[in-house]
Amino acid sequence: MSEALTELASYLGEARGNLIAASQLKYGELTLTATGENLIPLLTFLRDDAKCGFVNLIDICGVDWPQRELRFDVVYHLLSPKKNLRIRVKVATDEDTPVPSACGLYPGADWFERETWDMYGVLFTGHPDLRRILTDYGFEGHPLRKDFPTTGFVEVRYDDAAKRVVYEPVELKQEFRNFDFMSPWEGTEYVLPGDEKAKQ
């Protein structure tokens, strides 16, 4: 599998190196980094080129890196059924710079982009219906951002006496605790970001 990905990375560098800002083959996974203006041409090439054939969009997700100037990564996971290969394409952006929508290439991108906007606040230009998909209508903020409080801002519950859903400020029943535990499960052999202290 990694041999096929190595060949694919080499081919992409030769055929469309101008669209790829960086390429990384690590842990048996190929990740391409692109800029916002090169995203749609790169995704189009990956879908339409006979040596690629990435016709399936598996997922779009966001990653929040608050310490970076371009704090968000929008990550596209693609599958080539004919080649039996998966690839990842990343685009970095900030709170104010929108990313071009991939709905014209992959109709399934619609709800994935809505989810990424809902959870992280990343805007997508050209999206046909960019609105919340998982949070409530009046929800404020984006809950997967690292600066969003883990307790949230409001509590939503059904009030049996009033026979309706009510919104109230969050009231913690006990003193807030912050635990810094090591992960109890046996994970990968390589060190993931944030696990550096585990080796000490």
UniProtKB/Swiss-Prot annotation:
EC code: 7.1.1.-
Disulphide bonds in the chain: none
GO molecular function per UniProt: NADH dehydrogenase (ubiquinone) activity; NADH:ubiquinone reductase (non-electrogenic) activity; quinone binding
PROSITE patterns assigned to the protein according to its UniProt record, in alphabetical order: COMPLEX1_30K
Entry GO CC: plasma membrane
HAMAP family on file: NDH1_NuoC (MF_01357)
Protein name (record): NADH-quinone oxidoreductase subunit C 1
Taxonomic classification: Bacteria, Pseudomonadati, Pseudomonadota, Alphaproteobacteria, Hyphomicrobiales
